[in-house]
Amino acid sequence: MPSIHASAVLVGARALLIRGPSGAGKSRLVLALLRQAERGFPAFVRLISDDRSLIEPHHGRLLVRPVPEIAGLIEVRGLGIRRLGYEPAAVIGCVVDLAAADGERLPAATRLRVEIEGISLPRLPVAADADALGLIWGSLATDGAG
């Protein structure tokens, strides 16, 4: 099972796989999603993995799991590594690419899909200066007009 540099969070019934370079805000975005859920957003949110994730194709879907050695751990800037409840596995429903060079106001439809391990998934390319949390909630709450 390949290990990739990414965090993952369960939102509702599907996982968001959050990719990006070091310092892009993967852990911060996971914590922001958890905080939104505490404020009553109508979706269950729970950590799956932080910083490293295991991915595995399974019956045409892509599963994500935490790396066992760091399961339930998350970096909180200014506090260090902290422990948090987590989900042991989930189906990836969307890939969020932070600090994406192709993050645009009106992206082409081809940029809104990505293939990982032979499986095509929805993708949110988030520019370095964009509101990642707003884009995620916008994608969850709306349908494409295409």
Predicted regions and their residues:
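Conserved nucleotide-sensing/catalytic segment adjacent to the nucleotide-binding pocket
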Residues: 38-97
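Conserved NTP phosphate-binding and transfer environment spanning the P-loop NTPase/kinase superfamily
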Residues: 88-146
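Glycine-rich phosphate-binding P-loop
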Residues: 14-39
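Short, conserved beta-strand segments within well-ordered enzyme catalytic domains
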Residues: 17, 46-48, 125
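Extreme N-terminal, non-catalytic leader segments
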Residues: 1-19
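Short acidic/polar mixed-charge low-complexity motifs
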Residues: 14-16, 70, 119
